[in-house]
Amino acid sequence: GLTAAKKLGMEFYDKELIDAAAKEIGFPAEIIADREQRLTNSLLYNFAMGTLYGLSYPKEPKLSELPLTEQIYVAQKKAIEEAAKRGSCVFIGRCADYILRSRPDVLRVFVYADRDIRLRRAIDEYGDLEEHIDEFMHQTDKRRRIYYENYTNQRWGDRENYDLMLNSGDLGIEKCVELICQAVK
């Protein structure tokens, strides 16, 4: 994502959305980041209680009246929409493909790879033990899937949600960046 953004001369947003949410909500970014990492259980709880954003509120609540997990989503959604209005940019995750789905100028990309390839890349980058990284990847994918599916009512990684899906295991990262840049132009 960052490499494609640099090559295209676009702004890049990933963890920056945590800072934007923190500013909007009035919580320290560290708390938002920590809560974002633990969203799975909170989302499951909220879902079970019927309190996910927009599902059971009789009127549009104030941001401060929402559970913190929903405040984070709403604040990040606002940051994504505002950044997209300012100009071309690249977002990593946080349902940006769904949030911006009605805009005709959006290219929705999903980059994936087989588990073994992702595991090898992570070990090369982080140098941790395979079993630790494998479990971390499993938990991260689970959190992403639950987050995406709860806020979009769509399946995470489903081809219908994206304009371009690239297997970085087969293509390599540089080729994926090249194809994304070509698709944007």
Label each PLM-derived region with a short phrase:
Residues 38-47, 52-53, 129-174:
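Small-molecule kinase domains that catalyze NTP-dependent phosphoryl transfer to phosphate-bearing small molecules
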Residues 75-126:
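ATP-dependent NMP and nucleoside kinases share a basic, alpha-helical "lid"
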